[in-house]
Amino acid sequence: AGWLDRWYGLWTPSVLVMFAFFTASTDGLLRRRFMLSCVFLWGLGCWLYVALPALGPIYYVPEIWKDFAAKIPAASAMHEALWANYQKMLAGRNGVLREFNPIYAIAAMPSLHVAAHALFVLWSWRHARPIAWVFILATFLTFLGSLVTGWHYAVDGYAGILLAVASYRLAFVFERGEDRKSTRLNSSH
């Protein structure tokens, strides 16, 4: 479980690497489609958080994770920080909201961690097949890590994957055009 805790911590660097990889393309259509799919993913994901507010099982049934917390120290520390911030937000409902940090907000449905990696699978499969295999594994590990650490229920990950597929497809609807063959790093299409 400790290695999944550490894996989950690599999520942000993996996202930044993929942003850099696809936005460095000389194909303007690819860059626009990729970034538009990310806008859809994050934008729709945030609206789904508002429409379907949910906390992960770590917050709903914290006693399950008490004995397990030592095995996932990074997640446990973040659980506590996010929960403290959430309590400040709840206290702000009765007056002025003070000391709330929106970066430390809690939302579970859908899992945007799983969704982002799934979106990278779709883009890599089309344009950089060797990287796709890495992100298939990354999506699986992130999904598994989200369950083990208590951040998400399984349905949150499934919803994230569906959101990734929808975001990918919407990018093609709104940015029409033909792919340049030279942008594909894989030999099979």
Residue ranges and their predicted role:
Residues 1-17:
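N-terminal transmembrane-helix/juxtamembrane module of multi-pass inner/ER membrane proteins
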Residues 12, 34, 53, 113, ...:
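Divalent metal-coordination and catalytic microenvironments
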Residues 16-53, 58-69:
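Interfacial segments of alpha-helical transmembrane regions
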Residues 17-24, 114-132, 162-171:
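Membrane-interfacial alpha-helical segments at the cytosolic side of multi-pass membrane proteins
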Residues 42-50, 139-148:
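Aromatic-anchored segments of alpha-helical transmembrane domains
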Residues 51-126:
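Membrane-interfacial catalytic/cofactor-binding modules of polytopic membrane enzymes
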Residues 56-57, 108, 141-167:
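Interfacial helix-loop-helix junctions of multi-pass membrane proteins
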Residues 179-188:
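Conserved small/polar residues in nucleotide/adenosyl-binding loops
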